[in-house]
Amino acid sequence: DAKADKFVEGTHYTVVATEKTSQPKVQEFFSFYCGHCFHFEPVAQKLAKNLPAGVPLEKIHVDFLPAAAPEVQQALTRAYLIGKELDQGDKVAGLIFNYIHRQGAKFGSDDDIRNLLLVNDIDAAQFDAKFNSLPMLNTVQQMKTLQTKWSENGVLTGVPTVLVNGKYK
């Protein structure tokens, strides 16, 4: 493949595992509190739209940045996932990024997060039903497990980090 020939190991990517995933996928580890992630978001959205059919961009929000308590960061993860479930993931990500990076505002409580989404046309009943639901908490825990796995083996050292097929960084 001519395009693949342009990428050089050690220059454009690093091999981080011996085996790749059984199904193609791209994972982006990011934080709403990360300025680099804020600036990378348009690139990530374009990447998601240009991936081959059936290859998802899985956005994994991390909770290890010192800018906010892990509980606040996990609440933002849930808010983003609600947006994604409502087919408004990019919109919700943009709202949260702008609130933090353009407005310089801080989330003091779950209600602050809820209010931001509700004033921007996210349905209150759906938000309330999903925010603390067991499936939501399980999904957040799965993200945390991936964060821990890749952090402990030295792959996830900062954000944004993009992994392709669980093998290439």
Residue ranges and their predicted role:
Residues 1-68, 144, 148-152:
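Extracytoplasmic thiol/disulfide redox context detector
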Residues 19-21, 75-76, 119-126:
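A broad, low-specificity signal for short, low-complexity segments enriched in glycine/proline
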Residues 27, 103, 117:
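Short, flexible active-site loop motifs that bind/organize anionic cofactors or intermediates
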Residues 12-13, 29-32, 40, 80, ...:
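Aromatic side chains
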